[in-house]
């Protein structure tokens, strides 16, 4: 895939991209912020072999990824949920 990603990627393209790259930028609408956001993530939790997940929930494509820049919660968790992402780079 080239550097100029189309505005809306297909689910299989997103899944292949995140699995093939060490890090990526993922863009999606975040209900928490009521806006479109872009986050830097990785498909595998650092220093482990624990991988992210993809599921269809209530008809939506949901990707669970490790947010590299997120503030960890009290358990050290930085997994985040991207619903219907529009692109990854």
PLM features: what roles do these ranges have?
Residues 35-57, 70-74:
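Acidic, low-complexity, intrinsically disordered interaction modules
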Residues 17-18, 57:
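Intrinsically disordered, low-complexity regulatory regions enriched in Ser/Pro/Gly/Thr
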Residues 20-29:
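A short, Trp-centered hydrophobic/proline-enriched beta-strand micro-motif
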Residues 2-16:
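Mixed-charge, Lys/Arg-rich low-complexity intrinsically disordered regions
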Residues 32:
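Acidic, metal-coordinating catalytic cores used for nucleic-acid/nucleotide bond scission
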């Amino acid at each position: 895939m080239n550097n100029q990603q189309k505005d809306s990627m297909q689910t299989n393209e997103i899944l292949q991209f995140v699995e093939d790259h060490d890090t990526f930028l993922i863009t999606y609408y975040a209900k928490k912020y009521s806006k479109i956001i872009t986050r830097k993530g990785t498909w595998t939790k650092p220093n482990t072999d624990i991988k992210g997940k993809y599921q269809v929930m209530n008809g939506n494509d949901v990707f669970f990824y490790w947010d590299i820049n997120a503030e960890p919660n009290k358990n050290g968790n930085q997994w985040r949920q991207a619903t219907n992402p529009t692109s990854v780079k």
